A protein has these predicted regions:
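Transmembrane alpha-helix/helix-exit interface in multi-pass inner-membrane proteins
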Residues: 12-28
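Short, surface-exposed helix-loop/turn micro-motifs enriched in polar/charged residues
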Residues: 2-3, 20, 71
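Short secondary-structure boundary micro-motifs
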Residues: 3-5, 29-31, 74-75
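Interfacial segments of alpha-helical transmembrane regions
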Residues: 1-15
């Protein structure tokens, strides 16, 4: 599952970059000139948050491998990664929702693919 997690994380990162190019929405500085930027220069495209997408992907993949009592931990970490992006002034809340959604979708697709490959290997 670790290899699938790495691959899914890369797909999430590059998927977020692709969505940014299609949507072409600025970061908060483009809409809120008084925003305080705590990281970088606030330039570039904002929707979706790549950090949130990768964090959500990693969280879902980890949740699939963890015992039930530990599953909330990666979800909380992914949530906090997104919140940090808003606090740093580099994303709007909608960017986080988009990133988390993309990440969860990619993780579910990766888990489905891993399951299919495992079943195919068992049947062979």
């Amino acid at each position: 599952l670790s290899g699938a997690t790495m691959a899914a994380g890369l797909v999430a990162w590059f998927g977020a970059k692709g969505v940014k190019r299609v949507v072409e929405r600025d970061r908060p500085l483009g809409y809120l000139p008084d925003v305080v930027i705590r990281e970088g220069d606030g330039s570039g495209l904002g929707y979706v948050s790549g950090h949130s997408a990768v964090a959500a992907t990693a969280a879902v993949m980890a949740m699939a491998a963890l015992p039930a009592r530990w599953r909330p931990v990666p979800a909380v970490v992914a949530f906090l990664v997104g919140i940090a992006r808003v606090v740093h002034g580099v994303h709007l809340p909608a960017d986080l929702v988009g990133g988390w959604s993309l990440g969860v979708l990619i993780a579910f697709a990766a888990l489905w693919l891993v399951d299919r490959l495992d079943r195919a290997g068992t049947a062979a």
